[in-house]
Amino acid sequence: MSNKNKKLFGVWMDTHNATIVGTEDHGTEEFKILGHVANPGADNNSNENHLHNQEIALTHKFFKEIASKMPNIDEIHITGTGQIQQQFIKYLAETPQYKNALATESTSNKMSDENIKDYIEKHFN
């Protein structure tokens, strides 16, 4: 299947921010910024167990919010800093709606929205 008929998405993410890029309309290959999602992180709590549970819950909410901006993924490329990309790929694989999506990843530094869009577009072309 050519990329023209696929729903292609890209995400730049770190532990606190994500930028979602995709081909919004079927039939167009033009990538555009679909949205931004922020993860404020856990509050400062002296109880380590509570803090850990809060971080897990907030990360899950962060992933869910990102995924909600990308219905029916055929292919996704996830890039960013750290190891959060692998966690997000695992989340997608465990979510029935996204489990058949082809996911790839890379590591990259923070970029402007325009550079993220160009980076993802270049990846799929």
Feature names for model-found ranges:
Residues 1-125:
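Terminal alpha-helical anchor/extension segments at protein ends
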